[in-house]
């Protein structure tokens, strides 16, 4: 055991001795030098091989080819991207040319704006709420011809197709004969404008040629966030395919001419009545449609479109428009009354008519414009309506008329009740027009009465007082004019003009008075009663004011003779109360142009004396005794 321990210790000491350590370190250093030598040799060999490749023409050629392939690949990629961008830009430009809202812009839009406008346009055409396709709009069991006949039977009209460029009738259904009494062959190929009323041609041209270029909403630019300007650039307009159209027009009816018994009578009224007989009101409803020229089967000699676009046409159904006359209702159900709004000049002529009047009166708005409302009033109601006309021109309050009869297009009468009020220009203080809200009165309302509408006392003789003695009177008989239905008064259109001139004259005279300078010319009211010392109210003392016959008063309240509106002594005479007019005789015989001029001269002298501009007043020129 002791020997074994000694062997182990000697072995450990031999291992820990410095001799072997130096040997190990020497071997490690020798191996590191060998490695460095090997690394230096490999790097040198690689550099030499590279130099050899560069010096070799074949290697240099391969290097150049490698670099060229990389460059060509980059150029090919850029060319592909450029062609793709160019193609996309061309499609965007073509899409912008097809969208009407993009055509309306004065500058080039960005791509996002064009795409957004295109989406909005597609939603407008197809309908965002109820989209449908052509495959499910009709049952599969029905053919196109059967569907067309069913639609025409349900609509009780005729189908027609009109070219938008010239108004040429390209197609019309056979059912047009039931309405216009023209055959299908008579109308196809003809111009639609030849069968329209002259006053409706402009309206129909507007429906055919108007392109929806103006955007209906404010568009925002995607880049700037600012509203896009909608300046329409001049140029050929593009029709919007799918745009709906609905309008009224009068078309000729192929009816036999009615013989007039009195051939010598050739008045304007009879001609207008004959024109009305030969036209009927058609309500056209449809949409614009575009077809390629190859599908239309057009003549080869027809002129091609300048831009090579599709042929735009109006596809519509025309229905005979019949006015809606309310029928009496026997139940207790109360519905909203039918009414329409009209605007009149101060002489009673129509300047605006609501479209609802067509359903009530059967007149188109353009038929009523420029005509006097008195031409349609029943002759028994003209007196009361003339009084209301005077009142509405003199007051700012609303005037409600009694029930009166208004002549409709077929010659019959319907019962209306109107509310009138005048609009006064705030700058000129003059009445510009009269607004009338006309309500249809049913028969049961007339029998039971309606307490919601105040009643005015009618004046049966005021209608005759409106006309001169040579043209009308209380005992004058109303002649029947050929061509004009009974119930209306011939020459009634001048009544409104006479009332307007009368009110304007009163405004002019009152406007010349200093006391009325600060007040509106519409505030014409009756003056205070005359002094007790003036018998009968005909003689005014100390520069008093004679009573003015108010145009809105009833015959029992109106004065017998007209007078001039003078101001009282405190306003006209001022500090000279000793100057006055003792009496003014207002007899009928003393009213003449010379007397009126003399009276006005005296009034002007009084005004000058009051202002200190003139001398003493000479009353010798007065036609009345002082």
UniProtKB/Swiss-Prot annotation:
A motif (Nuclear export signal 2) lies at residues 361-369. InterPro entries: bHLH_dom, Circadian_TF, HLH_DNA-bd_sf, Nuc_translocat, PAC, PAS, PAS-like_dom_sf, PAS_fold. GO terms for molecular function: aryl hydrocarbon receptor binding; bHLH transcription factor binding; DNA binding; DNA-binding transcription activator activity, RNA polymerase II-specific; DNA-binding transcription factor activity; DNA-binding transcription factor activity, RNA polymerase II-specific; DNA-binding transcription factor binding; E-box binding. Residues 17-32, 511-521 have a biased composition (Low complexity). A motif (Nuclear localization signal) lies at residues 36-41. One of its GO terms (cellular component) is aryl hydrocarbon receptor complex. Residues 401-444 form the PAC domain. A motif (Nuclear export signal 1) lies at residues 142-152. The modification N6-acetyllysine is found at residue 538. PANTHER family: CIRCADIAN PROTEIN CLOCK/ARNT/BMAL/PAS (PTHR23042). Residues 508-588 are annotated as: Interaction with CIART. It is found in: Nucleus; Cytoplasm; Nucleus, PML body. This is Basic helix-loop-helix ARNT-like protein 1.
């Amino acid at each position: 055991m002791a020997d074994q321990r000694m062997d182990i210790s000697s072995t450990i000491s031999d291992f820990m001795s410095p001799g072997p350590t130096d040997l190990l370190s020497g071997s490690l250093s020798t191996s590191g030098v060998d490695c460095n030598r090997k690394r230096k040799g490999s790097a040198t060999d690689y550099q030499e091989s590279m130099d050899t490749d560069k010096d070799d023409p074949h290697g240099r050629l391969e290097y150049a080819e490698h670099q060229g392939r990389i460059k060509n690949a980059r150029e090919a990629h850029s060319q592909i991207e450029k062609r793709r961008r160019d193609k996309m830009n061309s499609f965007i430009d073509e899409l912008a040319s097809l969208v009407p809202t993009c055509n309306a812009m004065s500058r080039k839009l960005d791509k996002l704006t064009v795409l957004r406008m295109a989406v909005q346009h597609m939603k407008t055409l197809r309908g965002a709420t109820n989209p449908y396709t052509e495959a499910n709009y009709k049952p599969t069991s029905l053919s196109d011809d059967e569907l067309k006949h069913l639609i025409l039977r349900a609509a009780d009209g005729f189908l027609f197709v009109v070219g938008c460029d010239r108004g040429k009738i390209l197609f019309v259904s056979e059912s047009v004969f039931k309405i216009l009494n023209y055959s299908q062959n008579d109308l196809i190929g003809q111009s639609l404008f030849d069968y329209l009323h002259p006053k409706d041609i402009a309206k129909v041209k507007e429906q055919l040629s108007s392109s929806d270029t103006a955007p209906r909403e404010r568009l925002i630019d995607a880049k700037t966030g600012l509203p896009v300007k909608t300046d329409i650039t001049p140029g050929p307009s593009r029709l919007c395919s799918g745009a709906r159209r609905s309008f009224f027009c009068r078309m000729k009816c192929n009816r036999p001419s009615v013989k007039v018994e009195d051939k010598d009578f050739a008045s304007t009224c009879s001609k207008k009545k004959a024109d009305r007989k030969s036209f009927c009101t058609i309500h056209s409803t449809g949409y614009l449609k575009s077809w390629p020229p190859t599908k239309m089967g057009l003549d080869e000699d027809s002129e091609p479109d300048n831009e090579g676009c599709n042929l735009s046409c109006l596809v519509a159904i025309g229905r005979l428009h019949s006015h809606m006359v309310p029928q009496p209702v026997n139940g207790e159900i109360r519905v909203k009354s039918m009414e329409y709004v009209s605007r009149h000049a101060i002489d009673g002529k129509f300047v605006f008519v609501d479209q609802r009047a067509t359903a009530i009166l059967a007149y188109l708005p353009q038929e009523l414009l420029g005509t006097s409302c008195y031409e349609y009033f029943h002759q028994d109601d003209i007196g009361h309506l003339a009084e209301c006309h005077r009142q509405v021109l003199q007051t700012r309050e609303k005037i409600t008329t009694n029930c009166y009869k208004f002549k409709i297009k077929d010659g019959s009468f319907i019962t209306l009740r109107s509310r009138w009020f005048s609009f006064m220009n705030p700058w000129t203080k003059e009445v510009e027009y009269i607004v009338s809200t006309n309500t249809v009165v049913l028969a049961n309302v007339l029998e039971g009465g309606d307490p919601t509408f105040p009643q005015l006392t009618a004046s049966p003789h005021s209608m005759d007082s409106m006309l001169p003695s040579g043209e009308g009177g209380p005992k004058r008989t109303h002649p029947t004019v050929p061509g004009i239905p009974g119930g209306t008064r011939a020459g009634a259109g001048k009544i409104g003009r006479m009332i307007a001139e009368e009110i304007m004259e009163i405004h002019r005279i009152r406007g010349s008075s200093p006391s009325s300078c600060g007040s509106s010319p519409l505030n014409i009211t009756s003056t205070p009663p005359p002094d007790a010392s003036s018998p009968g109210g005909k003689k005014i003392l100390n520069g008093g004011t004679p009573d003015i016959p108010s145009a809105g008063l009833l015959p029992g309240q109106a004065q017998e003779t007209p007078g001039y509106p003078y101001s009282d002594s405190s306003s006209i005479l001022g500090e000279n109360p000793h100057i006055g007019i003792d009496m003014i005789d207002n007899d009928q015989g003393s009213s003449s142009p010379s007397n009126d001029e003399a009276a006005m001269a005296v009034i002007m002298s009084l005004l000058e004396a009051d202002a200190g501009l003139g001398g003493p007043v000479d009353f010798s020129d007065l036609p009345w005794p002082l």
